[in-house]
Amino acid sequence: MSEVTDKTVEFLLRHSASRRPPDIGSLKEKAFERVNWRDAFDRFQETERLTLWETKSELDGVDEGAYRVARDALFPFAVSGSQGAVSFGNRAGHKLREVMEATGVWEHLQRETSGQKGAVVFADVCGGPGAFSQALFEMSRQYKLRMRGFGMTLRNVRGLDWYSSLPLGKFLPTYGIDGTGDIFNLANIEALLSLTIRERLKLVVADGGFNVPFNIANYQETLSGRILFGQWLAALKLLRPGGCFILKLFDTFSPLSRALLYLSTYLYDRVHVVKPRHSRVVNSERYLVCLGFLGTPGPWMEYFEHCYQVGFSDNDSIPKIMPTSWVMEDKTFMKDLKQMNSTIASNQTLALKMVLAKLQPS
């Protein structure tokens, strides 16, 4: 059987240079077509998706402890805790370092702030307890950049309280207008914007997510649709021109994921998807990395806000945010997307088969 190892893989996403930006503003007056998260997929790369799902399902009856032992034996580099992440004390910090190094984010920030006084300001959205913020402060010294950060995460949720080690005076936790830190309330994002409107905010990182029950783990992508859109929208509101955005994703097979990735290619100068080495090859996690924020046209922002407040009215429904054909007809984008999806899915499927084989009695 072929084998695969944990390693960083990076993909560039582009739109066709000959295609005009989509007429997003024309969509505002149209009613949203919604589907349940179970039905929020189409036939796009269906074979790859279902093959991956079937392989995952073979693990349903496997003891979780035995699975972890087999997984960590095969892929020891990405183990949890201090064994695999001595410098940061967590794996998340290493994942952030790897995606930033693979795409040149630090060098971009250095160019953006060259000759300017003051700190580079970042926002950590849905970031509690602060692994990304902690890593940014640590890494910034290597690149001779001074940083200040603002954070928003859910309040009074176990495990999400901000690390006490985050530097006082350089990091400000915020919880929005209602004090909850919940980005599903657009007013909380607006409150964070009001705090940072005069700041040179050049980086937004977003690592939000939630535990998905094992029996519906295949639907993690669509179950996470609302929080993904909210973090993506927050970056559009908070970033200054030229800024960068890093967002944790899962699978990217659904129409919603395609639309967000496609729209990003018009909103930023350069768009990547990275599967970092410390993100286990056996899982679907990957990161959207956008460099060089270009600004959001007014009609686009109005529509995105409307979509967030009306289209994502609950956690069970996924809206169709733009016509599927607008994305599918762009041959350049679709070629890039298919290559990324196929590579990550095939590596993940093979890695899971390796774990299953190791679990078989000798």
Curated annotation (Swiss-Prot):
GO terms for molecular function: mRNA (nucleoside-2'-O-)-methyltransferase activity. One of its GO terms (cellular component) is cytoplasm. Coiled coil: none annotated. Keywords: Methyltransferase, mRNA capping, mRNA processing, Nucleus, S-adenosyl-L-methionine, Transferase. The active site is at residue 248. It is an enzyme of class 2 (transferase). It is found in: Nucleus. S-adenosyl-L-methionine binds at residues 130, 207. This is Cap-specific mRNA (nucleoside-2'-O-)-methyltransferase 1. The lineage of its organism: Eukaryota, Discoba, Euglenozoa, Kinetoplastea, Metakinetoplastina.
